[in-house]
C-alpha cells in the first residue's frame, strides 16, 4: 500500500519524500502556474491550475533525478497524495520525434523506472497510484511511424499492477498549447 502524507508531513514535521523533500514544491489549491522548459528550442510551456490539496511539483530533469549517463527524464512531475495520482509531463518544442534520445515516451518511461528503483520515491509509482502521461507541444501531434510500440510500452508501464485497467487514451494525453 502506498504511503499517504499526513498533516504532520504537510506542516514540515515529517518528510514524506525523505532526502528528496527539497526537490518538491507544495502547491496550494487554486495556484496557477506556467510550467516552462527553458531547454527546448521554443521555450515550450503549459499552464496549470491546482484543483486539489496536497499537490506537489518536481522537476525530474536536472533536479530530482541525477544526470547519469543514458538516463532520460521527463520535464515535470505532479503528485497528488490525496488521490493518489502522479502526472508525468514532457514539454516538446516541436512535434514528437522518432529519435530515441528525444522521444517523449522513452523520457517518461525512464523516469518511471528510476522512481520504481528508488526506496523512497517508489511510492509515487506503485500499484495504488494512478499514473498519467502528458505530452505537450505547440504543433499538431503527428505520431511518427514506427513509434507506436513506444506508446504501447508507456501505457503498459502506466497500468502495471494497477487495480483498474484503463485504456491507452485514458492515461496518455496529448496537449497542444497555443499562445
Where do the language-model regions lie?
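Amphipathic protein-protein interaction modules
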Residues: 108, 112-115, 119-129
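Short, surface-exposed loop/strand segments
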Residues: 29, 50-51, 69-72, 97, ...
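Domain-level recognition of nuclease-like catalytic cores that cleave nucleotide substrates
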Residues: 2-16, 123-179
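Mg2+/Mn2+-dependent nuclease catalytic core
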Residues: 94-115
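Acidic-basic catalytic patches of nuclease active cores, encompassing PD-(D/E)XK
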Residues: 1-65
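Short acidic, S/G/P-rich loop/turn micro-motifs used as interaction or catalytic elements
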Residues: 64-68, 94-98, 140-144
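Histone-fold modules and their flanking histone-like tails across chromatin and transcription assemblies
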Residues: 63-83
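Conserved catalytic cores of phosphodiester-cleaving nucleases, focusing on short active-site segments
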Residues: 76-78, 85-94
Amino acid at each position: 500500500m502506498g504511503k499517504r502524507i499526513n498533516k504532520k508531513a504537510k506542516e514540515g514535521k515529517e518528510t514524506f519524500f525523505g532526502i528528496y523533500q527539497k526537490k518538491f514544491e507544495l502547491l496550494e489549491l487554486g495556484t496557477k502556474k506556467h510550467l516552462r522548459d527553458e531547454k527546448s528550442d521554443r521555450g515550450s510551456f503549459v499552464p496549470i491550475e491546482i484543483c486539489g490539496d496536497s499537490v506537489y511539483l518536481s522537476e525530474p530533469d536536472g533536479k530530482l533525478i541525477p544526470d547519469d549517463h543514458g538516463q532520460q527524464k521527463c520535464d515535470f512531475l505532479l503528485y497528488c497524495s490525496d488521490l493518489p495520482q502522479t502526472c508525468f509531463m514532457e514539454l516538446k518544442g516541436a512535434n514528437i520525434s522518432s529519435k530515441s534520445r528525444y522521444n517523449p515516451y522513452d523520457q517518461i518511461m525512464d523516469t518511471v523506472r528510476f522512481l520504481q528503483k528508488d526506496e523512497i520515491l517508489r511510492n509515487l509509482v506503485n500499484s495504488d497510484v494512478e499514473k498519467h502521461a502528458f505530452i505537450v507541444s505547440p504543433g499538431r501531434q503527428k505520431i511518427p511511424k514506427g513509434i507506436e510500440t513506444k506508446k504501447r510500452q508507456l501505457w503498459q508501464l502506466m497500468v502495471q499492477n494497477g487495480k483498474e485497467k484503463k485504456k491507452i487514451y485514458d492515461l496518455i494525453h496529448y496537449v497542444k498549447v497555443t499562445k
